[in-house]
Amino acid sequence: MGQVLPLVTRQGDRIAIVSGLRTPFARQATAFHGIPAGDLGKMVVGELLARTEIPAEVIEQLVFGQVVQMPEAPNIAREIVLGTGMNVHTDAYSVSRACATSFQAVANVAESLMAGTIRAGIAGGADSSSVLPIGVSKKLARVLVDVNKARTMSQRLKLFSRLRLRDLMPVPPAVAEYSTGLRMGDTAEQMAKTYGITREQQDALAHRSHQRAAQAWSEGKLKEEVMTAFIPPYKQPLVEDNNIRGNSSLADYAKLRPAFDRKHGTVTAANSTPLTDGAAAVILMTESRAKELGLVPLGYLRSYAFTAIDVWQDMLLGPAWSTPLALERAGLTMSDLTLIDMHEAFAAQTLANIQLLGSERFARDVLGRAHATGEVDDSKFNVLGGSIAYGHPFAATGARMITQTLHELRRRGGGFGLVTACAAGGLGAAMVLEAE
């Protein structure tokens, strides 16, 4: 066991997670069609503050993230402060770590708390796959810059004459890795082939995710942590996530064709997480500040770890790399955990990480560790379903997982929970949470 790194302030305070909330998650171009991520962020932070009745001046910092950024509002965090009635002097900045963005936001606020520069802050993220920054071609962009500098009409017309019809076509945001050109689904296909993960196994995990999520909603387990969203023209509120397939069967999954490797692939739209809109946020405080305000924390942040690996092959192995570090820093092992919540970007990616967490060979030959991190107990794993069912607004998923895990730990009488995710760029994140 390596060095334990307690997350406490100089006064010995633990980092308390006081409350968490999210919007319902909606599939692309459905309930939140036309609602920018900034508005979703304002929606959830405003409601979170209203529910907790925490005075606005108590919050000293807001760290928020957005993966698909809009050029007109590059600092979503500051826009949320200005758009929710928070104190205008509240420090606010934005972060981006792809699918682990709100993990990063939480870590940043925690570091400010430990440094003693603040005593309370908000962390979270929002993304919209329905409101996108549609760009222009590189050639058109260059011509427009040159036209802006041209002095005469003839010079401008000459510049425009260089363009062809194809140069005028809109350019949607890239869905591939900038450095490799590989799509996330291509990487999931790599992982399925590398680790021998079958189509049947992937479909079974996806089906399990939807069943567990549907059950969680039907039993009322998510009611406290998901707000009702009222969307223009305000005819019908959105109360629940709209991606969950409660009545599907395994046979339904088998009907879909591969989405990336059309001839030999096993990754489909059904065993992958969909493009989604939504926002989520959590309030963090020092333990003593929470007591001063008479607040009972949901739980505490025990440890966290971020890792990075090469992007060319099987890059979505973040959980297999970051989990042992987070456990080590928490002074725990896999067997000490009550719950394990892993982001399901793809069923193939999820199953590959589960396999490697229990692999002695991977631990020895790749991580340089004496023993495997530990087998994943199915009874502890994604007990309320995961991202395949709920959806994945990139920057919001981490805050969803943290809030959901802490609520479930409290229902079970407390314990330790692991939340972990892969992210684009070969990045990984893991956090250990504690509830009493």
Curated annotation (Swiss-Prot):
GO molecular function, one term: acetyl-CoA C-acyltransferase activity
Pfam families on file: Thiolase_C, Thiolase_N
Residue intervals passing through the bilayer: none
Enzyme's top EC category: transferase
Similarity field: Belongs to the thiolase-like superfamily. Thiolase family.
Described function: Catalyzes the final step of fatty acid oxidation in which acetyl-CoA is released and the CoA ester of a fatty acid two carbons shorter is formed.
Protein name: 3-ketoacyl-CoA thiolase
Gene behind this protein: fadI
